[in-house]
UniProtKB/Swiss-Prot annotation:
Highest taxon above the source species: Eukaryota
Tissue: Expressed by the venom gland.
Name of the protein described by the UniProt record: Hainantoxin-XVII.2
Organism: Cyriopagopus hainanus (Chinese bird spider)
Functional description taken from the UniProt entry: Putative ion channel inhibitor.
Length: 98
């Protein structure tokens, strides 16, 4: 009777290895999905929205391809209407100045 109870709690090394491998595989998939979600929220999409907004803004009709103060900007693609594009250590770049 005692040997039956003890054998129920013993696990073979193959089962333990398979559980560890499954855990590591699922952890990798979870991290990969987080990376893909973050990539989907790339600032390039936000830059496109700024350009579309500026195209429809009558106040900004002379400077249609620029970002207003405190809007996000990118030194490569979108210039600021007035002021300069400031990029902090953490976070998105934004237009600063008048």
């Amino acid at each position: 009777m005692t040997t039956v109870g003890v054998s129920l709690f013993r696990r073979s090394p193959e089962k333990i290895t398979m559980k560890i491998a499954a855990f590591l595989g699922l952890s990798f998939l979870l991290i990969a999905s987080y990376v893909l979600i973050c990539e989907a929220q790339h600032p390039g999409f936000q830059e496109l929205l700024i350009l579309e907004e500026n195209m429809r803004d009558p106040e900004n009709s002379k400077e249609r391809s620029c970002a207003k103060p405190r809007e996000n900007c990118n030194r490569m693609n979108i210039l600021c209407c007035r002021g300069e594009c400031v990029c902090p250590t953490f976070g998105d770049c934004f237009c600063y100045g008048d």
